[in-house]
């Protein structure tokens, strides 16, 4: 393991104001420099997490995201600029590029992949804290089960419209996500960024609380954790701190050790993407894609462009973005059956 190396002067100069803060001091700053944090999702929340932790001097940031930058992201996803959207850079890559400009002395490890049962445990390996930057409960349950299994602290967060929520999970010390939310909200029962939109202030607020909790965990200030479910509505000026009690002994995850989200899935999966008229198709077994060969095969059927990270194919009203691991985002439909049909027709089974 390579540990970032800093002189006393460099540390004191860059982080001088942070070191003055009583909760950090020099000892806390050195703990931050030696820490590794996993950020799952690098959209609105995740990019805010990444920038704050990078500037704070967390020594190693592992950033995972399955998507690429689009113009509609720029309103609230602070790590990205117009040229990232024009180039259709993967969010993890664009964030890593920006972070290296912000702080060249920390280690950035970007992963362009879909987080699932097959890779989550490898991704959290060696990490001190996991930060939630996702937009769906299935991935959060995955994070929860993996973190509970490996006793890794993680910080849940969500934001939609002007409302946000966050909670810190310390396995077997606090309730886990399944203790509080036994099941995901039924489809169409709760607002999403598709239906309610989202404003940037709630993103900043939720991320600020999540990052602050992370700093407390990394520096050992665990008695200062808020130990609650924090809820905010910045438009309605509402702030609530809901007691979460103690872990549920009958919880499938932290009580009974039944990590359902980590069980293998033998078939192709499809997921509706928040905020877009799009479906993600993931093959049951990731396969390396030769973009040049695929482009030659697809050109007679439509417009094809590719770079080292992804291939974009337009045909009629549809657009398929194919990643190196054979995942594809099918845009122009909200019907899973249609997306699967297009994937099978143009990419293969």
Positions of predicted regions on the chain:
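Adenine nucleotide-associated cytosolic modules
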Residues: 2-349
């Amino acid at each position: 393991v390579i540990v970032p190396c800093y002189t006393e002067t460099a540390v004191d100069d860059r982080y001088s104001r942070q070191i003055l803060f009583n909760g950090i001091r020099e000892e806390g700053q050195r703990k931050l420099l030696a820490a590794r944090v996993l950020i799952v999702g690098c959209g609105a929340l995740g990019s805010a997490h990444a920038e704050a932790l990078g500037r704070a001097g967390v020594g190693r940031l592992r950033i995972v995201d399955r998507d690429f930058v689009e113009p509609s992201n720029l309103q609230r996803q602070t790590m990205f600029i117009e040229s990232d959207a024009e180039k259709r850079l993967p969010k993890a890559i664009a964030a890593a590029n920006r972070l290296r400009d912000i702080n060249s002395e920390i280690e950035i490890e970007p992963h362009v992949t879909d987080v699932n049962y097959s890779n989550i445990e490898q991704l959290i390996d060696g990490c001190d804290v996991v930060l939630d930057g996702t937009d769906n409960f299935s991935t959060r349950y995955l994070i929860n089960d993996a973190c509970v299994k490996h006793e890794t602290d993680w910080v849940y967060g969500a934001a939609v419209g002007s409302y946000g929520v966050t909670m810190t999970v310390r396995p077997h010390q606090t309730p886990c996500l399944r203790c509080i939310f036994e099941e995901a909200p039924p489809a169409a029962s709760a607002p999403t960024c598709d239906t309610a939109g989202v404003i940037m202030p709630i993103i900043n607020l939720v991320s600020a609380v999540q990052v602050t909790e992370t700093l407390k965990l990394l520096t050992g200030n665990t008695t200062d954790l808020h130990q609650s479910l924090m809820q905010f509505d910045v438009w309605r000026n509402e702030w609530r701190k809901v007691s979460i009690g103690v872990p549920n002994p009958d919880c499938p995850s932290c009580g009974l050790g039944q990590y359902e989200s980590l069980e293998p899935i033998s078939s192709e999966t499809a997921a509706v993407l928040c905020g877009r008229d799009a479906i993600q198709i993931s093959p049951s077994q990731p396969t390396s894609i030769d973009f040049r060969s695929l482009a030659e095969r697809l050109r007679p059927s439509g417009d094809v462009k590719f770079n080292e990270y992804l291939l974009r194919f337009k045909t009629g009203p549809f657009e398929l973005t194919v990643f190196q691991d054979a995942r594809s985002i099918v845009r122009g439909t909200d019907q899973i059956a249609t997306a699967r049909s297009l994937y099978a027709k143009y990419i293969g089974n």
